[in-house]
């Protein structure tokens, strides 16, 4: 029998009832717990780092060709820090919401808290609806992007099938994520995912340096404002992967320890993205403008094929990360979220995969779609809405006085915190959504005009006779 140990944890004003499971004493039980049941700080770090870097690792050199080397590096650092800030803000709001609810004796043991519920509990139904719309739409297209990336990558190993056919195949494969109950169960997958992207990043870096600069290579970026802001918005998308922050926090045994995890994960991710993007851009320059997937320019070797296979597995994992919150929303809508039957939940989840599959076939534009999603959805989902929600939540003096998490002292208290939130909201609204949205939509429409909807093989080289 599995016994439960309920522990009261007090951290400042934070009171939480934790539930820790004692696994079976058998070898099988211990192995299952080791690989399957994750809730530690390390699990959260692996989840954040693994989920953040994903397929954008392959499109960042493309962004560098649009931005130029200096702007590419600066935007990565800038948006990395900004993303870490809003992830921190989301974590503060989660802790505030959960603390208030647990003081009311609400039990979350069979219920996964999500971002729209945090907004609902703190600010009301209008904020809930806003958060639900942007979060679900972003995660929907985030899943679409992973599916497109699978087809784009496998094509560089096996081009006997076109990318659309590969999308059909991988759509069926990714549908198996319906059997993964929650973020608790991504322990081994998150770890392996980060190992895979680490290998791929350093392969790209070393292979580009060994290849040397291509003949007559040019580094003319930035040349057009449209390309410049498209590239910048892809980087905004890169460091805006924290639409699943609340679900990752909820999977932790001690969610209040999350505060700095995303920043530390981002710093590690930068050790992968900066060298790889810079090296590939140095080697291939403007050629990347027509090759949004960096792997398409690197010579085919066993190392490259290994990178492709590892990224395919990682994209399957990231598909699960993006889709699992959608599964939760759908379960709650149908009233089966708290059922203990895994098979019943899996069957209920299957319809969620169908629109993702369909959209990946309509818009197979690997690279350009990242920027479009970044400007129109990520800008609000993980930057603007969290910053505004935090300011409104703590607008009154009593709310600030009773806040569970106080502002860091080095910021200068509430004034400093509000100043940062205002800057983030205004910057992302003007540069990310405004200029980025304009540029990304122009580029996206250009891809549709060039390749058409339902493109059979986006950016595929002509087949040799």
Curated annotation (Swiss-Prot):
Gene Ontology terms for molecular function: symporter activity
InterPro entries, A to Z: AA_transpt_TM
Localisation per UniProt entry: Cell membrane
Listed Pfam families: Aa_trans
Entry annotated with the keyword Transit peptide: no
Free-text tissue specificity from the UniProt record: Shoots and roots of nodulating plants. Low levels in roots, nodules, stems, petioles, leaves, shoot apices and flowers.
Key words, A-Z: Amino-acid transport, Auxin signaling pathway, Cell membrane, Membrane, Symport, Transmembrane, Transmembrane helix, Transport
Keyword Isomerase: no
Transmembrane domains' residue ranges: 53-70, 73-93, 130-150, 166-186, 190-210, 226-246, 260-280, 308-328, 350-370, 375-395, 422-442
Stretches of the chain found on the membrane's Extracellular side: 71-72, 151-165, 211-225, 281-307, 371-374, 443-465
One of the GO biological process terms: auxin-activated signaling pathway
Domain of life where this protein originates: Eukaryota
Membrane topology, from the record: Multi-pass membrane protein
GO CC aspect terms: plasma membrane
Residue intervals on the Cytoplasmic side: 1-52, 94-129, 187-189, 247-259, 329-349, 396-421
Predominant localisation class: membrane
Family recorded in the similarity comment: Belongs to the amino acid/polyamine transporter 2 family. Amino acid/auxin permease (AAAP) (TC 2.A.18.1) subfamily.
Reported function: Carrier protein involved in proton-driven auxin influx. Mediates the formation of auxin gradient from developing leaves (site of auxin biosynthesis) to tips by contributing to the loading of auxin in vascular tissues and facilitating acropetal (base to tip) auxin transport within inner tissues of the root apex, and basipetal (tip to base) auxin transport within outer tissues of the root apex. May be involved in lateral roots and nodules formation.
Protein name: Auxin transporter-like protein 3
């Amino acid at each position: 029998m599995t016994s439960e140990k309920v522990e009261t944890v007090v951290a400042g004003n934070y009171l939480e009832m934790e539930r820790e499971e004692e696994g079976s004493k058998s070898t099988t039980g211990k192995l299952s717990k080791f690989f399957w049941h994750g809730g530690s700080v390390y699990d959260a770090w692996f989840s954040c780092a693994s989920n953040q870097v994903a397929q954008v690792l392959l499109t960042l050199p493309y962004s560098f060709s649009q931005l130029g080397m200096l702007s590419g590096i600066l935007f990565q650092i800038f948006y990395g820090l900004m993303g870490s800030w809003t992830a921190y803000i989301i974590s503060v709001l989660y802790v505030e919401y959960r603390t208030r609810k647990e003081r009311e004796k609400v039990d979350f043991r069979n219920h996964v808290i999500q971002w729209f519920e945090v907004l609902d509990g703190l600010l009301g139904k209008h904020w809930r609806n806003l958060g639900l719309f942007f979060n679900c739409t972003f995660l929907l297209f985030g899943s679409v992007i992973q599916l497109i990336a699978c087809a784009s990558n496998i094509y560089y190993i096996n081009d006997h099938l076109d990318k659309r056919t590969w999308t059909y195949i991988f759509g069926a494969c990714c549908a198996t994520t319906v059997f993964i109950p929650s973020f608790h169960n991504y322990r081994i997958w998150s770890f392996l995912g980060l190992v895979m992207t680490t290998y791929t990043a350093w392969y790209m870096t070393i292979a580009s340096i060994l290849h040397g600069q291509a003949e007559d290579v040019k580094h003319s970026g930035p040349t057009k404002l449209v390309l410049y802001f498209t590239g910048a918005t892809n980087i905004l998308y890169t460091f805006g992967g924290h639409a699943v922050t609340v679900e990752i926090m909820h999977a932790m045994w001690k969610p209040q320890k999350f505060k700095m995890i995303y920043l530390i994960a981002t710093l590690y991710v930068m050790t992968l993205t900066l060298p790889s993007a810079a090296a590939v851009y140095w080697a291939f320059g403007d050629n990347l403008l027509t090759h949004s997937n960096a792997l398409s320019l690197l010579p085919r070797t066993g190392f490259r094929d290994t990178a492709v296979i590892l990224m395919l597995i990682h994209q399957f994992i990231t598909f699960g990360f993006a889709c699992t919150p959608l599964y939760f929303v759908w379960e709650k809508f149908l009233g089966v979220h708290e059922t203990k039957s895994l098979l019943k939940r899996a069957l209920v989840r299957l319809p969620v995969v169908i629109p993702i599959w369909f959209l990946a076939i309509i818009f197979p534009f690997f690279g350009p779609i990242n920027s479009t999603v970044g400007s129109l959805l990520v800008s609000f989902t993980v930057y603007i809405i969290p910053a505004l929600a935090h300011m409104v939540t703590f607008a009154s003096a009593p709310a600030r006085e009773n806040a569970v998490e106080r502002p860091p002292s080095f910021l200068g208290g509430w004034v400093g915190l509000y100043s940062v939130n205002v800057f983030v909201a205004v910057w992302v609204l003007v540069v990310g959504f405004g200029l980025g949205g304009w540029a990304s939509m122009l580029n996206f429409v250009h891809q549709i005009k060039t390749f058409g909807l339902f493109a059979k093989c986006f950016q595929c080289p002509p087949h040799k006779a």
